[in-house]
Amino acid sequence: MSDVFERVKKIVVENLDVEADKVVESASFIDDLGADSLDLVELVMAFEEEFNIEIPDDVQESIRSVGDAVSHIKAHV
């Protein structure tokens, strides 16, 4: 597992109050991890802060899974 994935996983566990073993790259934030639209906004803000990046609004809409987040972050750090 990559460092980016582990950091994303930690943020997801803390923000969504889910068990760490449920946070896998294929997990959908909404369908698998129970996030709502506000949770998604808060996750993106946490990712931006953790990785010191800015995720544009149009990209935020395409981040629907843990893997989507990891891929985007890896491409911009």
UniProtKB/Swiss-Prot annotation:
It is found in: Cytoplasm. Signal peptide: none annotated. 4'-phosphopantetheine is transferred from CoA to a specific serine of apo-ACP by AcpS. This modification is essential for activity because fatty acids are bound in thioester linkage to the sulfhydryl of the prosthetic group. Keywords: Cytoplasm, Fatty acid biosynthesis, Fatty acid metabolism, Lipid biosynthesis, Lipid metabolism, Phosphopantetheine, Phosphoprotein. Residues 2-77 form the Carrier domain. SUPFAM superfamilies: ACP-like (SSF47336). The modification O-(pantetheine 4'-phosphoryl)serine is found at S37. One of its GO terms (molecular function) is acyl binding. One of its GO terms (cellular component) is membrane. Pathway: Lipid metabolism; fatty acid biosynthesis. GO terms for biological process: lipid A biosynthetic process. Its main location: cytoplasm. PANTHER family: ACYL CARRIER PROTEIN, CARRIER DOMAIN-CONTAINING PROTEIN. Carrier of the growing fatty acid chain in fatty acid biosynthesis. HAMAP family: Acyl_carrier. NCBIfam families: acyl_carrier (TIGR00517), PRK00982.1-2 (NF002148), PRK00982.1-4 (NF002150), PRK00982.1-5 (NF002151). Belongs to the acyl carrier protein (ACP) family. This is Acyl carrier protein. The gene is acpP.
